[in-house]
């Protein structure tokens, strides 16, 4: 089966492929909010029907949360599993969007045409690059070049609570030669990238309670403990003035990268100034003594994601609030153990409490360790060749600052290696207002997967 007519078909069908993606993007499949449960079901149904349209035996599989979509195409050669997720992040704050987030559109920008809307880059646009590549192969040759299993999740943005039980229950069905994941970005625009390591994730949150009820700040101001002031003091104490996390044992299992790897990352084409300026920074912040890429890819973090309490309405209300709340996450590297680290963080926070300040922790949040990819597998070199041919420059092996738990679960649950290839850019504003995905990334992403399928099936 020849590749050139497949690439020509992709080029000709690009407008139709964008319209098809827009149909999926219009479904507000926000997994973390129960109000959107029906929409997550609709997105799963949409994908089942779309996969069936290209000859995939696809079905929606129930879980205690949102459904999985699983599909199979038989064929010769290697057995590949493709993973993506159809759920998206919440759209708050809505007033910062330039247009409704679930009304996708094409925009002209100084850097070319982009698709704008929630899920364009994370991850609906990305997962559809693979499906569109398969569609083109099917249209031109009547079949796909190899055996493929499709595994599409609906809870990635809400911690994947159903993922491991589903994988364990369906291990025999999902087991493949290698997993392909399209949920990552390129190190710089136009630089094709294969992720060789990611960071793990730990989530937690707590509530501080001071007085039993909100108090009059005149009657009690002075002698009363203010939980908002206490939570601010505690949060500020979690880092020192060099940006290091102060939790005892936090850096256990963290390793320095080699000089060779540091040199490779330094030569990968990363534009630090553009990366920082795009979000309003003039310099890198964080742990002292490390480059921006090292901070993003090889160092752990403890980030405060939300801090609130007291009166939030218009005007003023002179109260000392009863409660204050904090949400935080940690990005993990190396051999950091999320369960052990959670215990250490909680113990440290509790050691900072003053008398009469009570704490309650969330009990339902899970963590995942940092996965490392087996780049010695021949599929990595085959994919690098395919990507280099499409983008007319050498593909690079990079780290990723984000967390994709499924990458580690394929190894720990199914004994499979994974390869992460994505076409997003750092300025795509994923998880933020005005998320976008470059039309070029979508187009060349489809072509890239078509080439990768050809290489892996040769």
Each model region followed by its residue ranges:
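Short beta-alpha connecting loops at secondary-structure transitions
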Residues: 190, 215-219, 366-368, 428-441
